[in-house]
């Protein structure tokens, strides 16, 4: 299943490759949180509908509600898809998580957390929401990729 999901992710990222925008454009907004070198290796695509791998096997494993959830963004490796520009900070946390855990590590952990805790209580999501809240509320600047490595 992991290989099927990763193949779908790679195909999805390939299909949007021409529309990808480099996140380095956010360096001044996110300075102190995300190093320029990290942002230069992260991309986003603004889409009308968030792409998800709607495989019957995922539904059989209990991911139906996650698949049907109206998400504002989702991250696949170094690229995230957003329906709103507001979600960049949150999705960049997930880019850092993917980079640290690797494709299989992230997919396995994310699936396990969704099944065990549900979306809103999953540790990877809670980390992203907490860091996003810190940024939105003008909190202390934190090097996000380093924070992810230390706290994941």
Enumerate the predicted regions with their spans.
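A short, surface-exposed helix-loop junction/capping segment
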Residues: 2-16
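Sec/Tat-exported extracytoplasmic proteins
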Residues: 34, 100, 132-135, 139
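Post-HEXXH active-site segment of zinc metalloproteases
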Residues: 69, 98-130, 146
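Auxiliary, metal-adjacent structural segments of Zn-dependent hydrolase domains
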Residues: 17-74, 78, 130
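Active-site recognition of the HExxH zinc-binding catalytic motif
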Residues: 86, 90-98
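Hydrophobic (often cysteine-bearing) scaffold residues that line and stabilize catalytic clefts
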Residues: 22, 26, 85, 120, ...
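Long, well-structured alpha-helical subdomains associated
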Residues: 138-152
